Amino acid sequence: MTVLSQAHCEACRADAPKVSEQELADLIRQIPDWRVENRDGILQLEKVFAFRNFARALAFTDAVGALAEAEGHHPALLTEWGRVTVTWWTHKIRGLHRNDFIMAARTDELAKGAEDRA
């Protein structure tokens, strides 16, 4: 099994398959702090990250944005004082793809680095 945090996104087309229920169960175990949300029939991965202040939350948001640009896969980001909500899903397929789990794991790695600098 590939470690998600070390994987990279693959190009995704509109006809790419969503993760199956079994794949979802297997992949979510690798990112246990993430929740699966269903918004208007679209499954999404979501997690809230806590920080000591707005500046640290904003720096984390910038780091996630840079990662998203590098991978060509972009989340919804909500930055507030002391917290950032990150939501991953694949817009083209209106649901979850393996890429979303990769990016969630890589987001966790960024958060660990942010904690080290706190």
Swiss-Prot record:
Enzyme class: lyase
One Pfam entry name: Pterin_4a
Gene3D superfamilies: Transcriptional coactivator/pterin dehydratase (3.30.1360.20)
Highest taxon in the source lineage: Bacteria
InterPro entries: PCD_sf, Pterin-4-alpha-carb_dehyd, Pterin_deHydtase
S-adenosyl-L-methionine recorded as keyword: no
Keyword annotations: Lyase
SUPFAM superfamilies membership: PCD-like
The keyword Magnesium is annotated on this UniProt entry: no
EC number: 4.2.1.96
GO molecular function, a single term: 4-alpha-hydroxytetrahydrobiopterin dehydratase activity
Catalytic activity entry: (4aS,6R)-4a-hydroxy-L-erythro-5,6,7,8-tetrahydrobiopterin = (6R)-L-erythro-6,7-dihydrobiopterin + H2O
GO biological process: tetrahydrobiopterin biosynthetic process
Family statement drawn from the similarity comment of this UniProt entry: Belongs to the pterin-4-alpha-carbinolamine dehydratase family.
HAMAP family: Pterin_4_alpha
Protein name: Putative pterin-4-alpha-carbinolamine dehydratase
